[in-house]
Amino acid sequence: MFKFITLFVFLLSTYVLADEKINGIYIGEIEDKYKNTYPVTTNLEITDAGVIKGQYEYKYGGKNWNGIFYDGKFSGKDLLIYWKEESRQGWLAINFDEKYASFSGTWGSTNNNGNWSGKK
């Protein structure tokens, strides 16, 4: 019984600590479906209530664009989160490295529109 409780506490603490490790600002690139890249700042956070949200900002066509992340679902080192800016919205699916210091993944609105990366 003691081994079971110890294992449960270890797994629970690992899950909670992993969640907290994604909090922060990541500097990276967005790549569109034409392989053009744009610098992006991605800010992710998990609230005390366990809600995963954030903001992002990038420059395209001489204009600064920004949006929000909402309704994130975290599983292991994978995060699926939704984004919205002005009249557009879509999804971002990323995978974190072992230390949660960087990520890479894909994004889109209906289909895969390109890649998205970031590093603390």
Where would I find each of the regions flagged by the language model?
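Central antiparallel beta-sheet cores of small beta-barrel/beta-sandwich binding domains
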Residues: D19-K120
